[in-house]
From Swiss-Prot:
Protein name: Fibroblast growth factor 13
Species whose genome carries this gene: Mus musculus (Mouse)
Keywords: Cell membrane, Cell projection, Cytoplasm, Membrane, Microtubule, Neurogenesis, Nucleus, Phosphoprotein
UniProt superkingdom: Eukaryota
Job description of the protein: Microtubule-binding protein which directly binds tubulin and is involved in both polymerization and stabilization of microtubules. Through its action on microtubules, may participate to the refinement of axons by negatively regulating axonal and leading processes branching. Plays a crucial role in neuron polarization and migration in the cerebral cortex and the hippocampus. Regulates voltage-gated sodium channel transport and function. May also play a role in MAPK signaling.
Name of one Pfam family that matches: FGF
Keyword Nucleus: yes
Region (Mediates interaction with sodium channels): 67-201
Stretches for region Tubulin-binding domain necessary and sufficient for tubulin-binding: 157-164
Signal sequence interval, chain numbering: none
Amino acid sequence: MAAAIASSLIRQKRQAREREKSNACKCVSSPSKGKTSCDKNKLNVFSRVKLFGSKKRRRRRPEPQLKGIVTKLYSRQGYHLQLQADGTIDGTKDEDSTYTLFNLIPVGLRVVAIQGVQTKLYLAMNSEGYLYTSEHFTPECKFKESVFENYYVTYSSMIYRQQQSGRGWYLGLNKEGEIMKGNHVKKNKPAAHFLPKPLKVAMYKEPSLHDLTEFSRSGSGTPTKSRSVSGVLNGGKSMSHNEST
């Protein structure tokens, strides 16, 4: 009997000690991990909040990225196409001019936007074939890119062409390095031929397409007070009487 009572007391003491240990573990730091169970609970809550927040961030769709190039456009006439700070479009023989750098941004199948790196202005062609520059990306800023012989490339308006023959209107420079009206440029002549000289590949955000009716000609970069309408629409220079190739 005494042995049984002793055994019972021993069991009770052991159980009491185990209960005390378990209670102590809830608020006493563990020597091996150095964190209390209370701290662990807090960490679990914080980690869940953080995980929830990270899941939210993952749901955000990244900006659409378009792979284009920074390039120079060398005309078969012996000039580099350039877009100057005042919006003038012409040709130059100065290979080091920073205004000869263009962003060629793909905006469709074999369709590009041509944007000056320095000015951030887009090249555009209006319904009369005049070249001008625009702060906003509109349908007139879209050019079809076609590979010609000997790796030369032509750029024609996506929305304007000869009504009867269907012949395209092309970006072109004459022998003096002056910009030409698109409907005066023939695709098989040197005036229309450009040789891209890519410098690097770049990623671009898709340009926001603006409707032409949103802007007046003055809002699209044409004309300015100091110039005539025809002058600015012809690349910012007075039109040449002889626009031959």
